[in-house]
Regions:
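C-terminal segment of classical bacterial N-terminal signal peptides
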Residues: 17-25
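Bacterial N-terminal signal peptides that target proteins for export
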Residues: 2-9
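Short, surface-exposed glycine/acidic/tryptophan-bearing loops
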Residues: 72-113, 126
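Disulfide-stabilized extracellular recognition modules
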Residues: 104, 109-150
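Secreted/periplasmic proteins
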Residues: 26, 45-47, 51-54, 96-108, ...
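Extracellular structured ligand-interaction cores
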Residues: 65, 99, 129-131
Length: 150
């Protein structure tokens, strides 16, 4: 086989192998995301999280927007922050790479959502983005709520 044909053969082999590896990695990554989502079912299917999503999307519908989609990874981030606020007593934004609404003190999803609706900046957060995550924590009578949007 002449040198040019050998180089062409090697180049084509590498190209095909690279595509196969990339395809396998992509499938593997999709499978990993699916497994992680299933691991978070306890959170995203929780009645309080579902109620927060319902109230959030009712407000979006009221102003003519499509519903936000519940994102399991964002729910986990919001949940971790709500737990942190409840454990530390600090009422502070998390610095996550999302728009974020937090609330401390009110005892129901309705009260937290209404507080966000009545605050212009928080309301604007609710109306932006397509994905949303929620978290909440009650500890020693302290209620902490967190929503993140992107």
């Amino acid at each position: 086989m002449c040198l040019n044909r050998k180089l062409l053969f090697v180049a084509l082999t590498l190209a095909v192998t690279g595509v196969a590896v990339t395809g396998a990695r992509s499938a593997e990554m999709s499978e990993r995301v699916e497994k992680n989502s299933q691991k978070l079912d306890w959170l995203v299917k929780h009645p309080t999280i579902q109620k927060l999503l319902e109230l959030h999307n009712q407000e979006r519908a009221r102003v003519g927007l499509s519903p936000s989609k519940l994102n399991p990874e964002m729910c986990l981030a919001a949940q971790k922050h709500a737990v942190w606020m409840a454990e530390t007593g600090w009422f502070s934004h998390s610095g996550l790479p999302y728009r974020e609404n937090i609330f401390m003190g009110v005892t129901t999803p309705e009260a937290a959502t209404n507080g966000w609706i009545w605050s212009p900046a928080h309301h604007q957060n609710m109306l932006s983005g397509t994905d949303v995550g929620f978290g909440y924590m009650v500890l020693n009578g302290r209620y902490c709520w967190c929503s993140v949007m992107q």
